[in-house]
UniProtKB/Swiss-Prot annotation:
Keywords from the named record: Cell membrane, Chaperone, Lipoprotein, Membrane, Palmitate, Protein transport, Signal, Transmembrane, Transmembrane helix, Transport
Membrane topology: Multi-pass membrane protein
Localisation: Cell membrane
Positions where lipid (N-palmitoyl cysteine) attaches: C27
Name assigned to this protein: Membrane protein insertase YidC 2
One Pfam family here: 60KD_IMP
Alphabetized HAMAP family for the sequence: YidC_type2 (MF_01811)
Length: 287
């Protein structure tokens, strides 16, 4: 059961990684300049609105397209914040359910198919009773994939954005000094690590993504426009503050440690009581 579960989780992570790489490769998309006359659902309803919004905010802030990208990134994060809050609550609920899940696993520890099926049913019932969706953690990433590709195309297909300069780099070109890709990778790691804090070891079976994503971001940031690295950095910083404010991981970690200590103390008391009861029975038999 555990091996099968781990395999499914690894398969899911691999699918997400491959999907992200495929999305960012942009295979087969149009390279024509984006305008209000652009045809096709993707170009007309996704890429052009992003390009127009970045341009509008850039004009509002003195013609800096980098500032426009930063503002639009924050707006997108605010729009998907309800979903992120739901994800954080789901993660916390999953963490709180781990002791009960462990009890079920001990109760249905047999390896026969009937017991495995019963364990699966009881686990799903527990999730439903507590309104927990184990797959909720993947949904924000899936939603951000098309947004990321839309950003990429808006930058690549808007000459004004592509040729605009920010600090030492051109937004449409990779950072020549690799500073932004490194910062993007580090903030990705920090964001993921903080999100995983306070979770139980069982929940951390997905923790490999904490190390996979920064490496991917680093390599993609080296080859893709620096504007995307800027998008990642701002988004990651926003996520860090959002996590700290909504679902304080340091507080959660202390709570989990306190619960674990209380559980250990309770187990010791039960064991001590059982030993005393057994010794009393043994004394009566000798009499």
């Amino acid at each position: 059961m555990k091996k099968k579960k781990r395999f499914k989780q690894k398969l899911l992570i691999a699918s997400l990684v491959i999907g992200l790489m495929a999305v960012l490769s942009g295979c087969g998309y149009s390279t024509d300049p984006i305008t209000s006359e652009s045809t096709g659902f993707w170009s007309h309803y996704i890429v052009f609105p992003l390009s127009w919004t970045i341009t509008w905010f850039s004009d509002l802030f003195g013609g800096s397209y980098a500032v426009g990208i930063i503002v639009v990134t924050i707006l997108i994060r605010l729009l998907i914040m309800p979903l992120m809050i739901k994800q954080l609550k789901s993660q916390k609920a999953m963490t709180n359910l781990q002791p009960k899940i462990k009890e079920l696993q001990e109760k249905y520890s047999s390896k026969d198919n009937e017991t495995k099926q019963k364990l699966q049913q009881e686990t799903m019932r527990l999730y439903q009773e507590n309104s927990v969706n184990p797959m909720m953690g993947c949904l924000p990433l899936l939603i951000q994939m098309p947004i990321l590709l839309g950003f990429y195309q808006a930058i690549s297909r808007t000459a004004e954005i592509k040729t605009d300069s920010f600090l030492w780099m051109q937004l449409g070109n990779p950072d020549p000094y690799y500073i932004l890709p490194v910062v993007a990778a580090l903030t990705t790691f920090l964001s993921s690590k903080i999100s995983m804090m306070g979770q139980t070891q069982q929940n951390k079976s997905m923790a490999m993504i904490v190390y996979i994503m920064p490496v991917m971001i680093l390599f993609m940031g080296i080859t893709l426009p620096s504007a995307l690295a800027l998008y990642w950095i701002i988004g990651n910083i926003f996520t860090v503050f959002q996590t700290l404010l909504i679902n304080n991981p340091f507080k959660n970690k202390r709570e989990q440690e306190a619960l674990a200590a209380a559980q250990v103390a309770e187990d010791r008391l039960k064991k001590k009581a059982a030993n005393m009861k057994a010794s009393k029975k043994g004394g009566k038999k000798r009499k």
